[in-house]
């Protein structure tokens, strides 16, 4: 039985910098609401690498009542308005991230005027730009900086972002925190994601899905659906419901 259906945001709920397909959003939201009265429809929540304010806003669209994952491994609890992480001491543990943020401000942003640092992020250093070619140009600089100064850090990229994380502070860690908070196992979770940062979590959940716009690495570890973004999320949600109904 799948007890949680989890979705990524960018590339799944919508294409970055584009208006969502509101008809699909409403259908996904309706299934989530219906889950509160049904044993076969799992509730919906989010696992994203984007910062808390964006994740919270989309969670409100979808009427998410469960904790959700932001910045890959931060778990926000509505109850008590609190954030849970796997870090022992955020200030000390994140010193390499703080250093990367300063380097991004001094070395990357002046060279790439359309790029911005994700200033609201707590636990990782994120760069966003609406043009894929800008992100592609930034990636080698970040790779070299990490290799030279912080070889243990993880880097995950999308068409519109570069994210630098503490080692292991990725979406699999976020999924583990989420599962523990709901007293379920990873074998009771379905997840849909589209880029490399989703791969660690997709490999470990029971039902991994991806939209047709996913990267090759993601398609290789998931059931790839013949639909993009929110259409694929809705399709995956229905597949999970049918799976539960068949048990």
PLM region spans:
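Active-site phosphate-binding/coordination module
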Residues: 26-114
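Asp-based phosphoryl-transfer active-site loop
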Residues: 2-18, 202
């Amino acid at each position: 039985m799948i007890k949680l259906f989890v979705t990524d945001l960018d590339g799944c709920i919508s294409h970055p910098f584009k208006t969502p397909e509101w008809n699909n959003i409403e259908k996904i939201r309706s299934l989530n609401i219906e889950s509160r009265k049904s044993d076969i429809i799992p509730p919906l929540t989010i696992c994203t690498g984007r910062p808390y304010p964006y994740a919270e806003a989309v969670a409100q669209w979808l009427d998410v009542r469960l904790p959700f994952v932001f910045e890959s491994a931060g778990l926000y609890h509505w109850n008590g308005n609190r954030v849970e992480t796997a870090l022992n001491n955020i200030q000390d543990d994140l010193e390499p991230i703080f250093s990367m943020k300063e380097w991004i401000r001094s070395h990357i942003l002046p060279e790439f005027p359309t790029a911005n640092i994700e200033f609201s992020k707590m636990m990782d250093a994120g760069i966003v730009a609406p043009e894929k070619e800008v992100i592609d140009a930034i990636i080698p600089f970040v790779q070299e900086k990490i290799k030279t100064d912080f070889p243990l850090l993880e880097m995950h990229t999308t068409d519109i972002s570069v994210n630098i994380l503490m080692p292991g502070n990725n979406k699999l860690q976020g999924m583990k925190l989420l599962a523990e908070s709901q007293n379920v196992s990873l074998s009771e979770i379905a997840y849909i994601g589209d880029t490399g940062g989703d791969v660690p979590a997709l490999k470990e959940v029971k039902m991994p899905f991806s939209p047709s716009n996913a990267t090759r690495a993601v398609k290789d570890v998931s059931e790839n659906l013949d639909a993009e973004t929110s259409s694929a999320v809705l399709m995956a949600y229905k597949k999970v419901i049918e799976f539960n109904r068949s048990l």
